[in-house]
UniProtKB/Swiss-Prot annotation:
This is ATP synthase gamma chain. GO terms for molecular function: ATP binding; proton-transporting ATP synthase activity, rotational mechanism. SUPFAM superfamilies: ATP synthase (F1-ATPase), gamma subunit. Belongs to the ATPase gamma chain family. The gene is atpG.
Amino acid sequence: MIGIREIRSKMKSINNTKKITKAMEMVSISKLRKIKKRMCSSRPYFNIINQVISHVITGNLEHYHTYFNQRNVKRIGVIIVSTDRGLCGNLNTLLFKKVLEVLTEHINEHILNNLFVIGTKALTFFKSFTNNIVFSLSNLKNDFKIIDLMEMIRISLEMYISGKIDKLFLAYNKFNSTIIQTPTLVQLLPILKPKLGKKEVKKTWDYIYESNSKVLLNVVLNRYIEFQIYQSILENLVCEQASRMLAMKQATDNSADLLKALQMNYNKVRQSSITQELTEIISGAAAVSLN
């Protein structure tokens, strides 16, 4: 049977781990609040620019932009948004699984791929899968700016315009709630025409462009792509902190359960030890009295 000293050592070790996981849980809660507030504050702009693009696509365009061209697909590009650190459950695993399904499907159709990875975890994982990593971006801070993403966005758009990629996808974790995060893969380019209902069709209109409509359209569409990527990274950061908070809470709860079980075991061993000592003392006293 395990001794009292070993049980005490285990309890001390688990208690130290519990303190660490509890501290990490509290840190994640604090970070989650800050990033979630930032994500929510940017959503109105995100929703409005989506509405603008929907109306632009359904309207009668004076200039048909390259971003709307449907091509024969020979090569795709995928922007993958992951985390830099672990301890966030299966957040990255589920996303990578979804991306691999899409990549495998295209490879089976002899379609090549180019990857743009954000986060150390995606870079480490997809390095073992393909050599076609065009651009990688790691160690983004929680207070990152859209300018930090511009080089990657510029390269991906230039590759699409020049015909080096025919479709551009964006893979990230979508935040639904603190408990539910959904691995999501959306097509960025070519921009798809939205499916509108009867009520929405009646609300569509054409824009009147002042000055050069071609230049204005190009600026709006580029801003739309930029903000899609920016918002996806914000959502992924929120998902990361929510997943880490839940993972650390689970670890803390498991530590408490282990400590409870060890405490009971400790009490039993100690009780057995005391009983044995008392028995030995009584037996010794009885032997002395007989002599």
